[in-house]
């Protein structure tokens, strides 16, 4: 089997997303492991700058049966950000917008926003976001949701799932969906 079986699909992806697609040795190596130290080399790392780019790459991955691993900053100790099947890694760090709706008591945050940034944005509006994993300055809310992060405040206030009331995302087909 070829070390890079998805080269044609990756070329198509580069045509559609351009600079968001990194196939360099260094770029792929940097996304090959997380804090668990489990390591598998992907064929490409895609860093979407707009939400719709996630849908484009998932649609293409689904069409060509390319395995996809979603990654924030790789702080997980569970191995969930390591691309165990190779394929493509979606690096969500650029999708980090945060909007606090103080009147409704809601935070709208991109998957790449760090927990620490969300906490500070909420505090600036008089609100408190309790989940506080020890890696809060580096870990992303997308990863927190995926792993149900808690931290020291978890016993008193609850963990991430207790504070999520709606999600936006994409199905493997690239279709945009909203839950909640």
Q: What kind of feature is each model-predicted range?
A:
Residues 69-71:
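Conserved PLP-anchoring active-site segment centered on the Schiff-base-forming lysine
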Residues 66-67, 128:
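Residue-level detector of anion-binding/catalytic polar loops
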Residues 97-101, 107-180:
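FAD-binding subdomain of flavoenzyme oxidoreductases
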């Amino acid at each position: 089997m070829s070390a890079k079986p998805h080269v044609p699909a990756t070329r198509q992806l580069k045509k559609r997303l351009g600079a968001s697609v990194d196939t360099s040795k260094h770029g792929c190596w940097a996304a090959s492991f997380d804090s668990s130290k489990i390591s598998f080399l992907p064929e490409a790392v895609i860093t979407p700058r707009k939400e719709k780019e996630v849908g484009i790459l998932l649609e293409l991955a689904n069409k060509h049966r390319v395995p996809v691993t979603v990654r924030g900053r790789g702080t997980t100790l569970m191995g969930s950000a390591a691309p165990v099947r190779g394929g493509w890694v979606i690096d969500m760090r650029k999708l980090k917008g945060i909007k606090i709706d103080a009147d409704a008591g809601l935070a709208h945050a991109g998957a790449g926003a760090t927990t620490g940034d969300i906490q500070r944005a909420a505090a600036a509006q008089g609100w408190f976001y309790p989940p506080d994993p020890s890696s809060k300055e580096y870990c992303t809310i997308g990863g927190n949701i995926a792993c149900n992060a808690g931290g020291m405040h978890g016993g008193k206030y609850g963990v991430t799932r207790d504070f999520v009331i709606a999600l936006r995302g994409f199905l493997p087909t690239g279709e945009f969906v909203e839950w909640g």
